[in-house]
Structure formats: C-alpha cells, structure tokens
Amino acid sequence: KDNQPHHPFQTSWGVSTRLIGGVIMTHGDNNGLVLPPRIAPVQAMVIPVAMHKDGVLDAANALLDRLKAAGIRAKIDDSDQSMGWKAAEYEMKGVPLRVEIGPKDIEKNQCVLVRRDNGEKVFVSLDTLEETAKATLDAIHDGLYQRAKKNLEEHTFPAFSLEEAKQLQAEHGGFIKTM
C-alpha cells in the first residue's frame, strides 16, 4: 500500500468449520450427511440403472442436461459400481436427490426420484422432471428447516437463575435461555 511495506493482518474465528459442524450435527443421521439442497454442492445425482443396456446411458445423460439447464446442480455416476454401492455412496455424502433411470423407466417415460431426507421414492414422468425435481428440492429444504426449528424449540428451556439453569441442564440437556 502506498508503495511502502505494511504488516498484513486478518482475523479468523473458525466460523466456516463451526458452520459445517453445525450442519452435520443438525441434519446428519446414522447413514451419513443430510445436506440442505441450497448448500449442497451436488443437488441431484443421476444414476443409470443397468447402464450397459441400449439407450440407458444416453437417457441418463439427457436427464443430466435437462436438470443442469433447469438450474439444478447435478452430476451423473456412470461408473461400473453396483447400483447398491452408488445409492449408499450418495446417501452417505448427503446428496439431497437421487435420480434413477433404467430400461423399464425409459419404456414408461419415467424416472425415479429418491429423497435423501426421508428415503421416499417417487416415479416421475419425464415430461415434468424439471418442475418435480425443483419442487422436491424445495420440499426437502423446507422439511429440514422445520425439523431443525422444532428440535430447537423442544430442547430450549428458560432459566431465571444460575441454579435453575444448572438444574435444567442436568435434567434435560439441550439449550438454556437465560432470562
């Protein structure tokens, strides 16, 4: 600055690490991460079922292109891993939505959406894929928010003295709101 050397300075509060930990503690489950769609690096993972059969990989790539064009952060897993491995992998990584398509789905002009938050599987017409995927991601986000809010409210207790706070903490744990 001003063509003169100056000592650099900055502050670091470790906030990014704390926020990541908060998301994991709030939304994680016994199967791994559960990421809210708005912060998930990958919102939807396209998984071709029996991808070596005619047309399946092409159909999966077409779904990927459509999801990306709709503004959804999506990727495809075209590896040779088994379907069960792929499903478990993206469940553990917290990808909010799995999009599966196989030969029978192509025949029926549909795909399967699987939600990470509750495991619900929905058969979706390919004609409404983008709208349904966006609505499902919004529903996942809203559901995670409401569940976290309810958990916070149920585990927050008011205390009017230090003794009361100690007693509440010993009996209930959770959060103490001092008044």
Summary of predicted features, one role per range:
Residues 1-179:
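NTP/phosphate- and nucleic-acid-binding module
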